[in-house]
Amino acid sequence: MLHPRARTMLLLSLPAVAIGIASSLILIVVMKIASVLQNLLWLRLPGTLGIAQDSPFWIIAILTLTGIAVGLVIRFSQGHAGPDPACEPLIGAPVPPSALPGLIVALILGLAGGVSLGPEHPIMTVNIALAVAIGARLLPRVNRMEWTILASAGTIGALFGTPVAAALIFSQTLNGSSEVPLWDRLFAPLMAAAAGALTTGLFFHPHFSLPIAHYGQMEMTDILSGAIVAAIAIAAGMVAVWCLPRLHAMMHQIKNPVLMLGVGGFILGILGVIAGPVSLFKGLDEMQQMVANQAFSTSDYFLLAVIKLAALVVAAASGFRGGRIFPAVFVGVALGLMLHEHVPAVPAAITVSCAILGIVLVVTRDGWLSLFMAAVVVPNTTLLPLLCIVMLPAWLLLAGKPMMMVNRPKQQPPHDNV
């Protein structure tokens, strides 16, 4: 016979697995539709019209039209496509299900149109809202927080293709003063994360790792170098943190969301013309292209890092629906490659991983997630001790500093005031 603790853990196992699978399937469907639309907008359509897909005219036109289209969705859809991601954490309160269709459409348009945001925040919002709404009907005795945790864990597993990230994140959020052991509380979320990761793996494998030269033995000087790189990345990220609320307030002086997002899309188009197509989209595939292109110089990497960070701030401030983690990873990779080109004596594995750690820490203020992203992009077990040590001064630098989030005015409703 099972111990009562084991029976308690098994109680939510089936719902956890179902939520993990559903979270992954929603992500897969959204990404597939966005991929088809992206192929149409950036390959087939310009080819049919005889226009180069990387021409300045096409980049500006598509991003401007994308902004207008997203603005129309936010203006006229029920629930106004959910909350403004610039004002929300990654894992937030559930939104009304009526806002989800508009949110999904706005996300797909942004992903396909080349906006420099990832899918993580809207997908998380959709999955949490559905899990809470359906779970409350089927098992009303389970509280909303449990459904929120299961949905967020399943989504994290699906996004990163592994339950490890969920285990790291929830090991700190669920580690309260309760007498219930931590792993008892982690059991159901890890089931959801594992189900989400395995389901994603059946259809595609998220490819984060980069072909960067292997890092050998750690030396004391490497710790200092890594800490300096992380500090540089944090400094760059804090510039974006300073700019985001100010640009957000400036953009939201335009009361019409169609015009506001149209202007935002136009600015993104200008930035895309300056840095080229590799600076567009969420950044994961593009960072692979960036590493593979041996022709990039130090100034090219610097330009890509600056433009991508600026595009991230503009997209978030304009009200596009998307997450900030994936483009931040791109910024970290570009910054790390730039620093390696500038100081070749410091291995690229150190500069890239520590730059990712620093910039993701600024964006998420989550040490475990920052370590995870640095470790999966530059998969080298020798780097893990160095990253853990570099995390300490990086965390000190950010202690008490503002987050990359806009404080919503008290009089503003939960959704965009349109």
UniProtKB/Swiss-Prot annotation:
One of its GO terms (cellular component) is plasma membrane. Disulfide bonds: none annotated. SUPFAM superfamilies: Clc chloride channel (SSF81340). Signal peptide: none annotated. It comes from the Bacteria. Its main location: membrane. Keywords: Cell membrane, Ion channel, Ion transport, Membrane, Transmembrane, Transmembrane helix, Transport. It is a multi-pass membrane protein. It is found in: Cell membrane. Pfam families: Voltage_CLC. The chain crosses the membrane at residues 10-30, 54-74, 99-119, 120-140, 149-169, 186-206, 223-243, 258-278, 300-320, 322-342, 343-363, 371-391. One of its GO terms (molecular function) is monoatomic ion channel activity. Belongs to the chloride channel (TC 2.A.49) family. This is Putative ion-transport protein YfeO. The gene is yfeO.
